[in-house]
A protein has these predicted regions:
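Short catalytic/ligand-gating loop segments at beta-alpha or beta-beta junctions
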Residues: 3-14, 101-123, 175-179
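Structural motif corresponding to the C-terminal cap of alpha-helices
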Residues: 27-31, 101, 167
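Catalytic-core regions of hydrolytic enzymes
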Residues: 1-62
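Acidic, glycine-rich loop-and-strand cores that form catalytic or ligand-binding grooves
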Residues: 78-107
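Active-site-adjacent mobile loop/cap segments within catalytic or ligand-binding domains
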Residues: 48-76, 104-171
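Second-shell loop/turn segments in exported
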Residues: 5-13, 34, 73-83, 141-150
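Glycine-rich, acidic and aromatic/proline-enriched surface loops and short helix-turn segments
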Residues: 1, 95-99, 123-128
Length: 180
């Protein structure tokens, strides 16, 4: 099953492994993933939204981390595009989040970096992919914002802007951010 690689024996691994598998199943047979069987839906990107664990001794902001992976499948996606597109997607989304959060909420919001790491969710999808670790759910300084609905809206809008910029760059199109 695309939802349970372990056939129900390990809910933890099924949770994170199913995401890349079902992205490939949805996109299989389409122009973005022509060699795999699937539903022939041209999925342009995959995105995993997480918070992560971690605390600081002085309760400072932990901030936002972006994760992608390039060193799989000969550094190419199924359609032949460079896996470095995941870096570009990650950079656009993370840059929009950090800029908007610093502007509207917290000038000291931390941009933790972009990790090119072999996380299953970043490695397996055959389309550009980003894992976002928005903030630390164990850290009070982060969660002061993480519990604020206005912050949720700002972050969601920043993600939308980054995805819009990424997609328009892929299709060589101008973009207009939907006004509020």
């Amino acid at each position: 099953s695309v939802y349970s690689e372990s056939n129900g024996k390990n809910d933890y691994t099924d949770d994170y492994k199913c995401r890349g598998i079902w992205v490939n199943y949805l996109s299989g047979g389409s122009a973005v993933n022509p060699t795999e069987k699937g539903l022939n839906i041209p999925v342009n990107m995959a995105f995993a939204f997480h918070s992560d664990a971690g605390t600081t001794l002085n309760d400072s902001i932990i901030g936002t981390l972006g994760i992608y992976y390039t060193n799989a499948y000969n550094e190419k996606f199924a359609n032949g595009a460079s896996r470095y597109l995941s870096h570009d997607l990650t950079d656009l989304i993370q840059s929009n989040i950090v800029r908007d959060v610093r502007t509207l909420y917290e000038p000291q919001w931390t941009r933790r970096g972009k990790w090119n790491q072999s996380y299953y969710e970043a490695r397996v999808p055959r389309v550009p992919t980003m894992l976002l670790e928005l903030l630390s759910h164990q850290n009070f300084a982060d969660m002061r914002y993480g519990l604020d609905p206005r912050f949720h809206f700002t972050v969601s809008r920043a993600i939308y802007k980054g995805m819009l910029q990424f997609l328009c760059s892929q299709y060589n199109m101008d973009y207009v951010v939907q006004p509020l």
